[in-house]
Amino acid sequence: MYQSIPQQGNYIYNGNNNFFPQQQPQQQQYLNNSNNNNNNNNNNNNNNNNINNNNNNFQQSYNNGNNNNYNNNNGYQQQTSSYDMYGNNVNINNNNNNNVNINSQNNVNNNNNNNNNNNNGNINNNMLMATSSALNNIVKVTNGYQQQQQQQLLQQTTQQQLQQQQQLLQQQQQQIQQQQAALQLQLEQQQQQKMVLMFGDEPMGYLPFSEDKNLMLLSALNTNVDGGSFYGIQQQQQQQQLQQQQLQQQQQLQQQQQQLQQQQIQQQQIQQQQQQQQQQISPIQESASPYYSTPIQSNTMLSIPSSPGIPSSIPQLNNSNNINNNSNNNNNNNNNNNNNNINYNSNMASNFISQHSNNGSNTSSPVPQTTYLQNSGGNFNAYNGSNTNSPITPSSYLQPTTSQDQVIPQQLSPNHDQNQQIIQQQQKILQQQQQQQLLLQQQIQQQQQQQLHQPQSPQLPQSPQQSPQQSPQQLQPQQSPQQPQQQPQQQPQQLQQTQQKTVQRPPIIQPTTIQPQSPQPPQQPQQKQPTINSSITPIQPIQQMIQQLTQNSSTKSTSKASNIPATTAACPKVDLLPNKSPISSYILPHDFEETLAHLSEKQKTRRRASQNLASRNYRQRKKQYVNEVEDRLDDIVQENERLKKELYDSKKILKKLLHENNILKSGGQLPNKSDIPGCTGSEDEDEDDFDQFDQQQQDGSADPSTPVVETEPDISVLVDRLQVDMSITTQDDLTTTLKQFYSTLKNRQDLYINQIKQIVNPCTQAKLALLDGEISPAQSCPFEDPSEKQHSDPNSSPIGDMPSPYEQLEPTKWWSNFCNEANINPEQENRVRQLRQESNLRHKKIIKERTHLNREIREYYHSKVFNGTVNNGGNTKSKKTAASTSTTTTTTSTSTTTTTTTTISTDVDISNNISSPVQSHLVQLSGLLDKLKENIDHENETLIQTYEKLGFILSPFQEALFITKIYNNIFSESSYSNIQMLHGIKDAILYSYVDPTYT
């Protein structure tokens, strides 16, 4: 808005918006250059703020600023007051700070003197002497030269933008190469990955409801296919995924080509518009060139000071003009181009528009500042204010000068050459992108030749992937062409606020118009600018394609959820990925609730069934896997126990050898061997060692390297626990106690069998043969093969080899009571009867075979060993020889005995004294002892298997009740050990039913 100069006193302006009082009146200087005699000099006083109008015609003035003051001088003077934007009351007499004296004369030359310090202009216009053609030429020429200047600046900015685009393109090409390399690595890794099943020695995998749910549920729909076929189907699925990805890539390439064609069409349209604009500018320049000459740059002009109440940032009219009229037909018109404003001064129809200003409320930056003046003698005085925003328009040929704060206007038309360069660069960039697309197509074709061997099946359409977020460098050049490009310099924030609050401006009134027009807002032409950064847009689909490839390749086995049949129940090993494709969410989508609302009842039922199948199959595989792990753990424990036992035996032998070595070093003699044939004298030491080891285990002073026997709970404790579990705890706890009870009996039975096997050795059997007393008649008979002789078993039971059918068995009294108490059903009774018959038959065979083996072993000792000793009773040497020979042969031929031969008599030659019949007899003895050990093992297996089968027949509660009854009722008269308890269970089963044929 305009500011008023103080009215009282004279002031001097120092150029810093400050006034200083002056004692002497300021001398005013005017540029008066006239060539005619009839000059009318009108001097305007600094303190005079009045407008003298000699004509009573209608005068209209429109000032730049927020306060619009209209003065109608029809023979009187009007004073107006208004408020500025900061609330200061400003009294304005007609036209503040721009005082104009208008003297209308006919055929008289007017000399207008303008005071530079106070911005007062005296303009004498001649009526009907203003020419509209001159004004139009001035406006067009000034606009044309401003456009040339703006185009030069545009070229610089476009070059910078093109350089930035090239850098961005290089970065994007590098990113594309890196992403392509990553995609190839992922594809190779996926091809090499195999389906990890839980069969055999491979791991079991993960839970079915993990990130990749689709394949897990599909695998549960068919449990009849093995893991190998599932792996083959998975390979087919991966190949079909690759096919789908390649088709998507081809579609994306086609879309990119279409976009490129559209961009080329847009560029052609831009070229046509630029040619039209250039054709419009060229005739204006040619028509205006003969009227004007080259201007001369002048010094700067001081700006009009601003009042203290109004900030200095508000644009004001700070330039003053001294215009000298040299002819009768000259009319001085001021055109303000700084803010795209044109001031028309004419006397036609007595309408005068003093000034028309447009601060460019739709613009974002000021325009170049130019001022030019011309005198009558051909000399030019140009004033370019250093702090001005409204320069004076030129009255001659213009060549604008720009300051450092100048910026490019928003709406402009670039040169044809510059546009061609931009188009060429864009075409080069498009060619590079096409080459990249060709490379991608070649890679896709190579992958198809290597991997695709089967026709593609229909798939569900994938939803478009979201484009990756662009970096700020990419987002900045990709602005909408409708929005103006941001210039390097911006207006102050206060200036933008004042521009937004300005009132509507009246349109420009041409000199040919007669009636005044109503105020209307200025309409700027919608000129379409070329999109300089349009070359970056084709790269976006490439980035989207690369992102889709990465997401699709990372989601393994998630395609064809609706068309692929159920394969197998094997649980594969899946990768936990953050991204999911739409196909993987067909059965279990990411937004479960929303998808559930759109599914039909049939689909919901199918999904629930597949989930149940997957859960059940997983539990089965998990149980199988746990059993395999437990079996392996048992094998490892047994191997560890065996190694501990071997270490213990080796240490014992080493200790014995060291003891004998110390005896021999000290000069002593080794202890004599036993006189009993087959005995070495070390058996007693072994028994003593075993007793000593047992005592150390109980005291806790055993050697840490020796094998430790784990202490197990007593049988009475387990029976009491079973009684409590039957009444209080659940079935699972009862089953756990039964398993512990079974393992305790089994371990104790194994230990008992190992101790029995120690008796089966030549020395112990010789002692047992001597204890028999009476020798049977078979001792004197020659040795015969036992298979040729048929011996009758004196201890045979009355039950024959062919037992009666189990249906004919009658239950005993106690078994009937137990069946009633335990609620045994008829099917269980039949199975118990079958078990009783089978175990009874096997037990009878084992006992019969053992009796036969014992008789043969004793007959062997009486006929072969003891008989030779009696016959050679007088010869001690032969006795020792026979004893030593028999001892050596028996201990070396028997592999299961724990005795070892220490020494052999040095005066006996084994090769000379042992004949072939004797050697055959020793082999026979070792075979008999081995058979006896096998018989003991068979009996142990029969007892354990009988108890196991009973557990399968009875329920946990019935089994616990059966054990407690045996322990409390049947064997309550005496305390039974764990081994006797196992035999008691067998006997209870054996005597549960009675065969009526043998009663």
Curated annotation (Swiss-Prot):
Keyword entries, A-Z: Coiled coil, DNA-binding, Nucleus, Transcription, Transcription regulation
Cross-referenced SUPFAM superfamilies: Leucine zipper domain
PROSITE patterns, per the entry: BZIP (PS50217)
Record region (Basic motif): 602-632
UniProt-listed InterPro entries: bZIP, bZIP_sf
GO biological process: negative regulation of asexual reproduction; regulation of gene expression
Region (Disordered): 1-126, 286-406, 450-533, 601-620, 665-711, 779-807, 870-899
A GO term from the CC aspect: nucleus
Main location per the UniProt record: nucleus
Domain of life from the UniProt record: Eukaryota
GO molecular function, one term: sequence-specific DNA binding
CDD domains: bZIP
Biased composition (Acidic residues): 682-692
Compositionally biased residues, Polar residues: 286-302, 348-406
Chain intervals for the UniProt region annotation (Leucine-zipper): 636-643
Residue span(s) of domain bZIP: 601-664
Skewed-composition ranges (Low complexity): 1-79, 88-126, 303-347, 450-517
Function: Probable transcriptional regulator.
UniProt record similarity statement: Belongs to the bZIP family.
Protein's recorded name: Probable basic-leucine zipper transcription factor N
Gene from which this protein is expressed: bzpN
